[in-house]
Amino acid sequence: MANYAAMTGWGMAVPERVLTNADLERIVETSDEWIQTRTGIRERRVAGPGEYTSTLSIAAGRAALERAGLDAAQIDTVILATCTPDRPFPATACTIQAGIGARRAAAFDLVAACSGFVYGLNVATSMIRSGAARNVLFVACDIFTHFINWNDRNTCVLFGDGAGAVVLQPSDEPAGLISCVLGADGEQEDLMAVDAGGTRLPATPELLEQGRQYVYMNGREIFKHAVREMAASSLEAIRVAGLSPDDIALVVPHQANLRIIEATARRLEVPMERVFVNLDRYGNTSAASVPIALVEAVEQQRLRKGDYALLTAFGGGLTWASAVIRWTA
């Protein structure tokens, strides 16, 4: 059994349609200045006809497989982190498994909202370390724009759609996940949620008329919890890894809001020059935001072989997760 699970392949996929702040000005009472000042977002990608969680995930997964130099038949496990599956069941990971041709792979979904990538990275790494898996395709994807009330300017300006994927394989040298800290607070579940569509509140015409199928959030409370928990779990993950913040080459945070990212960086005493930000172009892509940012950071050579990176995220649930990874590709 291997001690580590290296990321040997990576890829991303986003919808073709770009929705700018100027476009939103024609949909809801808002302005480019208002959105950028409060969020840092300029534009986001929005899924169109024929673009689903599965299709974006398959595209990102294929890119990751190509980068890893693996055939889909070599994948033994497919994991999808999402809270916006194609259907309530079966698992969308099964659709991905069939779509990429990984016929022999086990497949399952994992739900941890915007923290999903870091949660899933821990699960995939644990499977490889235990010997339960060798070649894992791990995808994080969300299509939140299908759960948005486009008349609610407090939420419709925030979200975008996308997918990010990594291939994980056994490694004897320190690689991939070095430390990980996960957390949750179910008592705060109502701070951000979609009410209708589950077993508690099955979707009915009455609930749909009330708009209960759309995401809602308490932005002020989410901000406070996010900064506190992302910073605390980040510092703990760095400590467990036996490092200091100065050893971290790049922080790759969940891309929810620029103010949250900046406030978290201040608590870590890490300059923004060492924090990767791309939410201005994609908005909040939920579980996909960290892997999309990671892929772009690698492509822009912000991460090099041997570097330590900090991944940190926060989402509905409430959930939060931070991890130190060592990049060896």
From Swiss-Prot:
Chain segments annotated as coiled-coil in the UniProt record: none
Top-rank taxon: Bacteria
Sample GO molecular function, one term: beta-ketoacyl-acyl-carrier-protein synthase III activity
Its EC number(s): 2.3.1.180
Gene3D superfamilies: 3.40.47.10
ATP-binding listed as a keyword: no
One annotated Gene Ontology cellular component of this protein: cytoplasm
Start and end residues of each stretch annotated as ACP-binding: 255-259
Keywords: Acyltransferase, Cytoplasm, Fatty acid biosynthesis, Fatty acid metabolism, Lipid biosynthesis, Lipid metabolism, Multifunctional enzyme, Transferase
Any one GO BP annotation for this protein: fatty acid biosynthetic process
Pathway(s) it belongs to: Lipid metabolism; fatty acid biosynthesis
Protein family according to the UniProt entry: Belongs to the thiolase-like superfamily. FabH family.
Domain-level remarks: The last Arg residue of the ACP-binding site is essential for the weak association between ACP/AcpP and FabH.
Full protein name: Beta-ketoacyl-[acyl-carrier-protein] synthase III
Organism of origin: Roseiflexus sp. (strain RS-1)
